């Protein structure tokens, strides 16, 4: 994470900021969280994330969910949409969305799931972003205004 004095943000760009689940077990996580709060309020930051839950990598699920909850809370407070990294935790993401009823948009980054899961996420109000590898059927059923394409 960049220290505020080290940052050289382009004036003609917008940004997204978040703590990726893979970095949640970093020994300096509390400092990273402080930096996240600073950057999230920057006027050029228009999205929160990539954040979420990854059952294969990162800290414990409990710790990842705690940090994810910070992102959700801040996205709501700052009125910014949320970009979510999710690996083998869609049941938890869906449950949290249903429980919290967020007013800000949620979008799953790098969605590769089957059409049935895509329909479930879309019905809950969660948008989908597709990278290089994805399920063609899931992509086709996702309305254009709720689907994104990725370059990474």
Regions found by a protein language model. Give the residues of each.
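Mid-domain alpha/beta scaffold segments of enzyme catalytic cores
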Residues: 1-151
